[in-house]
C-alpha cells in the first residue's frame, strides 16, 4: 500500500507510556497510519523524509482561551498560534458576544483559519445580570439552542454567574445548563474563591471544570470533588506544580492560556505555559501530556492528542526537547510552518471580511470635562469617606479600601489624593449611564488610560490622575471606534485602535502586538506596576472577579453580587 508520507528516524512521544520511542512515522489521508518499523514490505511512499533524530510530539491543544484576548480575528490568530505548535483550540467568544450577541459568535465561526477552532457557547452574557452591567447583547437559553446546532460548538463556556446558578432554579443560567446537559457536552466553570458548600452546589449543577487562579488548597478541594482543572499562567506557581506532581494528578488537569495579549502572542502561546511547567519541576513528558492528551479527552476530541494509528496527523517536530525548539509544525499531515521558511501562506487562504456594521459599534458622543466631575449628595458636606478599589500586583483581584476626601460645592476633590479616578461610560446608546470609582495601589501616577476593551461588558472605561488627560484619552478611544489609549500632559502618547466591536482589529498580529506593546510600556512609564498591566486594568470592570469592581451601573461588591455606593459616610 502506498502512503502519502514517511518520516524516518524520529523520537516519537507515546502518550500512553509518557515517553519517547525511536521509530518511523507513516501518514496517510491526514492521519497517522503506522508508528514503528518492519513495514517496508507492505507500506511505501514516494515522499520519504529523514527525521534526523528529531523529536515528534502531538500538536498542542488549548481548551480554554479567548481569541479576543489577542485583540485579533480568528484567521490572524491562527497564523500566529500555529507557529508555536498549537493545532487545536477551544475558544470561548464571550467578549464578542457581549458586544454583538449570537451575530458576533456566528461571524467568528464563519472565519476559517485552518487551525482547528472549536467553540464553547458563552454561558454568561452578561457576566452577571442586566441590573449590574449594560452589554450590547445577551445570550439566553433560546440562543443556546440555536448555537448547539453548529458542529464546532463542543462545550458550554465558563459559567460565571454563580449567584443565579445556586439561588434561582429558574434562572437563565440554569436553563442554559439544562439544555447543554442534553447534548452531553463539558460544562466549563469560573469559580475563583468558591469553596465548601458553595463549591459543591456549583458542581452539583453540572459545572465540573475551572480555569481560574488556583492555590494548593483550591486545587485539592476542587479535584477531590471531581473538577477538571485548567492551569493558566496565574496558577503556575512552584507550590501548585509540586502539589500536582506529588499527587500524580496528571489525569485531572490540562495546561491552558486563557488570555494571551497580542504583544505576547508574537512570542509564544501554549508552548510558553508548557515550558513554564517544566521550569517549575514538571517533566517534559508530563508537560506534553497536559498540553495534548488530557485536554483532548476533556473536550471529547478523541481523534487527536496522541500519535497513534487513526489519529489526526497534527504534530510538531522539535530539534531539542530541552528548550522546546520548534522546527516544523504539521496540520492534517501537511507541513504548515517551517522555522526557516516560515508559514505556508496558501494554507491560510481564507479572506473572509466582517460586515461593515461590526466596525461602527460605539454609540457615544465625545465626553466633556464636566461629565467627569464626581457629584456628591447634599447630605455629605465637607468631607466624605469613599470606597476604593485597591489593585494587587500579582492578580487581577482587587481589595476594597477606604479614603477620606474633601468635598467642595458638592464636587469630590480627588485629584490631589493618593487615588486615581475611574469612570465607566455606557457605549451602546441604551441608557447613557456614567459611574465613578477610586483606584489605589501601584497604578499610574500621572496621565490617563482609556479603553473599550473592558471585560466583559466592554463599555468605555477611563482612569486617570487628572480630568484633562482623562478627557483626551477617552475621546481618542471614541474617535478610533474603540481601542486602548494612554495620555500624558494633554497628549496621546500610545494608542491601539480596535475598531471591530471596540475590542479587536483585523490588522496583522505583528502590528497589533507592536501597538499594544507601546501602550503597555506607556502604562509602565506612568507608574503602573503589575505582572500584566493590560489585564489588570481591563478587569477592573469585571464584576465576577473579586472583590470590588466597576461597571456602568456603579461599584460592584462581587461576593454579594450587588451595587454599593462610592460614598460610605460623611464627616462634617
UniProtKB/Swiss-Prot annotation:
Required cofactor(s): Mn(2+)
Protein name: Adenine deaminase
The family this protein is said to belong to: Belongs to the metallo-dependent hydrolases superfamily. Adenine deaminase family.
EC number: 3.5.4.2
Keyword line: Hydrolase, Manganese
Name of the encoding gene: ade
GO biological process: adenine catabolic process
Lineage: Bacteria, Bacillati, Bacillota, Clostridia, Eubacteriales
Entry keyword annotation includes Manganese: yes
Catalytic function, reaction form: adenine + H2O + H(+) = hypoxanthine + NH4(+)
SUPFAM superfamilies with a match to the protein in the record: Composite domain of metallo-dependent hydrolases, Metallo-dependent hydrolases
Example GO molecular function: adenine deaminase activity
Species name: Clostridium perfringens (strain 13 / Type A)
Domain of life: Bacteria
InterPro entries: Adenine_deam, Adenine_deam_C, Amidohydro-rel, Metal-dep_hydrolase_composite, Metal_Hydrolase
